[in-house]
C-alpha cells in the first residue's frame, strides 16, 4: 500500500512545481483543487517560481514565454491570447506590463486586455478611454486587506515656458478600477520630470516605479512612483549611480520585494548591479539605501543596449545564485538573445526562432493568481 506523504511536505513539493504543470493537477483530487484556490498557497507559490521572459513581436503580434532551464537550455512557448475582444479582433501592438502574473496588453485602438497566460480563459477586456496614453501600469491599493487591482493610463505632452523652451510635462492621467469596472480622470498640474523610457514600468507591492529625469537639471535621474492607494505621483528615491549620457540604466524587481538597477558604461561595457538594502514596503516615508550586488568586467563583453534603438535589455538574478545574472537583449543585428553571466565568464544563447529585429521583452513571473473578472 503506498505511503501517504504528510500534508506539509505535499504542499512544499507542490510549491516548487511550475505553474503550467500545476494547473493540470487540479483534477487529481479535491484537496489539490481547493489548495490552488487558497490565497496563501498562491502567494507562496509566486515567491518560489523561477522568473522568465515574455517577448512580443511587432509584425504578427505574437507573444512568447522564454524560460531558462537548469542546464541553460531555453524553453520557448507561444502564448495564445484569446484575440477576439467584445467588439473586434485584438492586435497587441504596444508594450506589455506585468503585475502578479498578469499581463496588461494594450491593443491597436487602445482597448486593453488583462490576461494570465497560465490560467486558460482568464482574460479581462477593458474598454478604451478617448485619450491615447503613452504608458500603462497595473497595480493595486496596498492599504486594503484584499487586492483591488487598478490600471494607470498616463499620457503627456510638453508645455513651453515664456522663453519658448519645452521644459514641463502636461499630463493626462486616468485610473481604471476593477472593482467599479470604470475609468476616472485625475487632475494634475505641470510636471518637472519626464520618463527616461515608457517601456520600463514596474509594479511592486501594488505601487508603480520607473526611472525619470528632471527637465531642467541636466538630466538628473531618480525613481518616480505612482501610489494607487493615494492616486498620487511621488519621487521615491535617487538612483544609486549617475545618469551620464549613453549609460544604460534598467530598473527591475529583485527577489520579489526589492528594487534593482543595472548600469552599463557605454565606453567600457562594464556592468554594475545595485539592489536596495531593505524590502520595499511602499511606505512613502521609508529611507532607501543601495548596495552594490555585483560587477561585471569581462573583455569583449557586448553592449546590452543599442544607442539608437528603443529596445531595452531586461534581466533578473538567478533565484538560487545572487551572482548569476540572466539578461534578455538584442545583439548588434537586432536579434533577441539571452546572456548568462557569472564571474568572469558569459554565455550567449540565441532564441532559435525567427522574429523581426528589436522586439519588446520583459521579465515575467508566472502565477496562479486569478483575474477578478466581475
Swiss-Prot record:
InterPro entries xrefs: F-box-assoc_dom_typ1, F-box-assoc_interact_dom, F-box-like_dom_sf, F-box_dom, SCF_F-box_component
What Pfam families is this protein classified in? F-box (PF00646), FBA_1 (PF07734)
In which domain of life is the source organism classified? Eukaryota
The F-box domain sits at: 1-45
Q: PANTHER family attached here?
A: BNACNNG10540D PROTEIN, F-BOX PROTEIN CPR30-LIKE
Name of protein: Putative F-box protein At3g16590
What is the native source organism of this protein?
Arabidopsis thaliana
